[in-house]
Amino acid sequence: MKSALVVVGKSLRYNMAFLNYIHATIIQHIDLPDQTVYIDKNDKDLFFVLEDTIARADEIIIVTSHDSFNLINKVVATLGEESLELKKGMLIPSKATLFEEDSYLLKRDKKHINVLRVRETHKLPNLLIQKSSAAKLFSVIDLEEDALKALLEPLAQNYEIKITPTKLIDGWFVVEALCNRYGNIDNFFKSVMALLPQKIIHHPDNIAFIAENLEKAEKTISLAESCTGGLIASMLTKHSGISAVFRGGVIAYGNEIKESWLGVRTETLERFGAVSEECVREMLQGVMDASLSDFSIATSGIAGPSGGTKEKPIGTVFVGAATKEGKIRVEKLSLQGDREYIQIQSAYHALKLLLHVGDDIFLKN
């Protein structure tokens, strides 16, 4: 089943925070759309773009700016050879089967079309389209793609499941499992868990998985971030209830902050530098001592585009995770990409180390 998102209105296209909110909400309803189209209400091809998108997809969500809504309603009605009727204070296609404030749903030839009028800085109207995809997401760690496919594809064939792995970072894949008509996704997952114990995250959201398992185990975590600049803290605090497990974090960008706030020794910085395993180990211990948490994560590196040297080029990053019992893992990474992508990869590498040092609560399948 194909899905599509159409965003109408130039004002929406460049508001990245609002677009991220729209995408996150839609993913909860129809997963990740197979196609996303951006178009302005004044585009001369608007009619044909909508006609083509609706023809190609089965589930279509059309998000319009406030001043594009009425025009889109006319176009959608024309495409369905319908008139417009006043419903809930909206002039919308007459065959709309469900309608609420700023949202309505049409069913045409087994297709579902949900049109929404959105406003920046406001809560999105309700999505009326219902999730129908049989796809589920899970993650696999500590396997490379060839090995992952060799192990999972025979199982997938046995249970009539189509799998699509996506590489998050080295050794961490997000896998979409799509159930065919006669497939058995529950038995597929049981077999996967039996085949790969302590390598499977059976949850669609990796960060929510970490937060929920910390809460179940009544464990706390603290962060000492340098090159990631608070990104890991941001990832964790997107989840409601994280205050029960997240003690806090320090963005220790300058060496003087690493020394005075985290207790990193001057001789460590002078001898090894801030971008070093030795520094990250002391950052881990320093933030754990300050917060009295059960786990700590630390990052230090060169995200670029400047700051690299021959010995430590751009993309050189050290990440670490530790437990209060003294279990510590630190890794040196050589990453590629722009500044933001290097930071994101660093964050996930650090979180993967957390899964390992806390394997008794995260990977106890």
Language model: regions and residue ranges:
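A generic structural motif
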Residues: 170-181
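Short alpha-helical segments enriched in small residues
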Residues: 2-131, 141-156, 182-365
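Short beta-strand
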Residues: 164-168
